[in-house]
Structures are given as structure tokens and as C-alpha cells.
């Protein structure tokens, strides 16, 4: 298969789940996984792609779970936001160790730890070839980091939101429970809603749909998958307004 020499996307928003960082550990951050992800992002930067990153916090804390146990949801979500900052600090450090310039911006002020989020500063940094990591979600409780990824993607005028998962894309059913589940190559936004496919929460998904922000779901654990997606090769599932 011939590889397109030019990337298909100039500016991307990469959404990493917190769970992706824990590797096989089951909790926390696996340094090996972190370094591998930093190297994959470095490859994109070397191709001239502008990279924004949103990381979840589920490897360190889950606010929704404690809310069910009686904790105030707002408090739980604030704790979850801080977990994403911890992951962001780890990712920034991994990128710096890989000799990649990176900035960490938080939606909630954390002076001395990271920069405050600024839309104009983020775009300027991206244009200068720096990776920008967006932490603390949207800065508001009740919104997921998937919502933050779509919001930041729209704000920075990214070409696509790349959602890194543990499976090869969007399936017609749970591929673990159903071996006959079909992997979709392309889907329209309405197909996802009609088929009730689990891509991301409804608030995040409808935000992307309303602003015609394409979403590509792919397997981050597959070596080279991120590069193949960015080069426009057949990898994962593309969700857009094209039928």
C-alpha cells in the first residue's frame, strides 16, 4: 500500500483516555505507555502536524462513581479535573524528555503549576509547532473530557478530533461480547444516533455534530495507528456529516 507523503490533517485534537495511560497496571500511570505515546505524538510534530491533546483522568479518579456513593457531584468533578491536570503534567514531561516543545493549559487557574487556558495563546503555540495539552476538562462540572475534546477541537479550529480507544473503531455491537460485531469504516452523525452506537456521551457528540467536527475513533494500542490516521490511511472509524 502506498503511503500518502503529505498528512491528511494539518491540525488535530487528540483525545486520550486516562485509562490508556495506566497500561496493564490497572491504576495510575505506566511510564512505558506514556513514553510510547509521547514518541507517537513526536512523529506527528516532525511531519508538520499541529497537535492539541485532551487527556481524561479515569486512571486516577472517577467523580461519577463517588457521586453515586453520596459525594457531591460538583466536588467529585472538581477532583476529576485535578486528575486530568496530573496526567497532563506527566504527558508534558514525557514530551519534553522526547525533545518536543509542549505547553500545558488548564481550564481552572493553577498558578505555578501550568498556564491558564487561552484560546488565542493555544492557537499561537500550535502555529509555532508546540504541542498544547488541555487539562481540567471544560472547567465546569457535569461535562466529560470528551466534551472538552470536542469543545477545544472546535475552538482551535482543528481538522478532526481523534478519539484514542482500546478497540479498532466503532462496532455495531460490543466486540468483546459479540465476535460477529461489524467494524464500521465510515458513519454519518445521524447513523450513530439512530443505531445508538457508543462513541462518546451525547453532549459531546451533538456538539461535534452541530459544528460539523469530524471524529475518528481508533486503537491507540496498535503501533503506528495514530500516524496512519493522520496520513489519511484506512484506520479506525470516521464519523462526519458525509453520508
Swiss-Prot record:
Signal peptide: none annotated. The keyword Transferase applies. Keywords: Allosteric enzyme, ATP-binding, Cytoplasm, Kinase, Nucleotide-binding, Pyrimidine biosynthesis, Transferase. ATP binds at residues 15-18, 58, 62, 165, 171, 174. GO terms for cellular component: cytosol. It comes from the Bacteria. GO terms for molecular function: ATP binding; UMP kinase activity. Residues 23-28 are annotated as: Involved in allosteric activation by GTP. It is found in: Cytoplasm. It is an enzyme of class 2 (transferase). It catalyses: UMP + ATP = UDP + ADP. NCBIfam families: pyrH_bact. Homohexamer. Catalyzes the reversible phosphorylation of UMP to UDP. HAMAP family: PyrH_B. This is Uridylate kinase.
